[in-house]
Amino acid sequence: MKKIVCYIREKSNLLVAIPINMLLATVGLIPFLAAAQSSPAYTIQGAVRTTTDAPVVGATIVLEGTQFGTTSDVTGTFTLDLKQKPSQGSALSVSCIGYKTKRIPLTESNAAISVVLEEDNNLLDEVVVIGYGSVQKKDLTGSLSSIDGGAILNRQTQTVSMALQGAMPGVTVTRTNSAPGQSATIRIRGITSMTEGASDPYVLIDGVPGNLSDLNLTDVANITVLKDAASASIYGSQAAAGVILVTTKRGGNSGTSVTYNYTLGLDFPTSMPDYMNAVDYMKAVNELNYNDFPGGGWYQTYTKDVVDNYWNLNREDPDKYPNTDWLSLLLKDYAVRQSHNVSFRSGSAKRSTSLNFGYDDVDGLFTKNLSWKRYTLRLNNDFELFKWMKASADISLRKTDKVNPHTSPSAQMRYIPAIYAATLSDGRYAEGKEGSNKYAALMDGGTIDVHGYKMTGKFQLDLTPFKGFSVTGVFAPNFSYTKEKDFQKQVPYFRAGDSSTVSTKYITEATTTELKETRSDTFSHTTQFYANYQKTFGEDHNFSAMIGYENYKYEQEGLLASKSKFPHSLIPYLSAGGTSDVVAKSENVFELARRSYFGRVMYNYRNKYYIQGNIRRDGSSRFAPDSRWGTFLSASAGWVFTSENFMSGTKDWFDFGKLRVSYGELGNERINGYYPYQTTLTPAYSVGYIGNTVTSLPGYSQTAAVVRDLTWETTTTYDVGVDLTFLKNRLSLTADYYYKRTDDMLLTVPIAPIIGLSDPYDNVGTMNTRGWEITLGWRDRIGDL
């Protein structure tokens, strides 16, 4: 008889497919087993099978509201030992990946239980997150994609942003920097605006603004990407480049579990140029010069005697005739990265808790001074205070420690010629190329140490005064603090043949010892109030509406101070610098506020014809009062044509077909600067004469030109798509064609240099983006797989 195997596990693989695994996902069952082994007073036995009578191996059986549970064995049978007889009304929860969870009420007569699990292969019943709510996938009229937390975890990356690479159509993920912990750049359906940062998608974590770098991979339950205006317009001015909605894991009501996950990975440098030794380099340079000027002969730069005898000269005097493999000096063969994650979940019908702790340690590929460490903690709590009142309290903490070299050799190391020495034979640093020595700068030229601290919270109250109507209030504070210490150390070099131990010559990357200290703290908070109403009239008319208000406030303060002329490089503090005053100092303070009103209406007739409308009115402090507010609309419609009578003959192989169309407008106000419409003054000094004495007096000056009537950049999006499933929902196809047009782009406009002010922003420029997406999938169960 065919046997069905159900694995409840978290999987961990190495980058580059090196098979090193250490996983203790089954620790989650230890509380169940321990509880079951202590003097059982009541035993429940049974079997779990499929609708085809095949045994299900590894199904999880839990007594609801308790920590007691077990799993089915290779024959599909199970035994659950309890300390006492279950109370009246108790029930078992039986679950297995790929099957619908089943609830079995316990009675006096069912000490031996037979459980039949039905396959859960209907993708259309999947619930997906949308703005300020969720819907079944079959009811969507907009374009979106989603990926669950298990798939995210299996992608074996250090950051959530990189885990999205190649995971969804229309979502492009690139990485321009390979430094440890570096986040990726995400583009949803291409570039939306030419303004820096305006093409970044809007990220919300559990409904409030956040950053993907705040998340550990094990925190994620689901990620949904809203791609068209009909889906994203409920978020208004922040959603022009798309929206990424992250749902984190909650406690649930399936008892208590503890999971530990350890991942070890190795990173290798790839696509590096082949090493060219000194002789090959000299020959190549001579050939280059000969091709440019044949009349000068073959040996225009390096003489024939030097080229032919270089290896002998190198053996006799390697300092004067070096052969340096710069890549080998600057790069390791591989770098180690590791992650530790501990998850605790506990829950019942009235309360649940999810606690995730993560630690990431990533070593860089540079020989020295490149590393990244991250500590994350996320605590999610849910409470049912009354049947009509629920609350949640979420707290997240993150600490990052990053070390970078003061001077990164990443660009130059690929083409520094081998004829320049990095070190002399006695270990002293050599001159390099005309005083530039990337190896000396990397090893002893100083570091940039960045320490970041972040705390976020979300406190939510949900009221359901009567069926179908709910009111939600959210307050979400966010605090972050960053301190950076950029300590450049003076590095002396020596020429070949110089036997002195003290040098007055320093590499060009570090001619002085200098320290820059930076401090930055930000505080923001989001307040939301929204109400949802759902009602079915008769049996055919399904209606839902949502209305809400949101307020966002952001404050930032920063401080920079630097000092040079350090007598030594041992103590990286400003007080240890030279006798001169702090040579540079600056301070900045910024504020930003947004206020929004929004609403949505959804209607479908017989789950066949769908319409949806959204409206959002946004106000931003970046614009003058007369231009501050913008209204953004969207509409979409869907038609499930497989529900029509003329499609009745295709039901054996054509399960579902829906046509979608949408139109929407979205705004953008993300530009560099918080007061682009307003003249700002910067502290400055003016120099003049008082009598015959040249005198410097403090004052203020205008540094930037402004445009008073600056207003919203607007992106209009059109989308046509289809959702199709065939062969009992095993084969699925989703296809979309989209067109985006951005008007009144917020760009800097050049002005005459003689004016003496920097260029202002203005609403100029138009950009078009178009494209298509296709997702083809097959979902099936084949034997034990």
For the regions a language model picked out, list residue spans one by one.
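Low-complexity intrinsically disordered tracts that form flexible linkers/tails across taxa
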Residues: 400-414
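A subset of solvent-exposed loop/turn segments in beta-rich extracellular surface proteins, enriched
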Residues: 418-432, 492-508
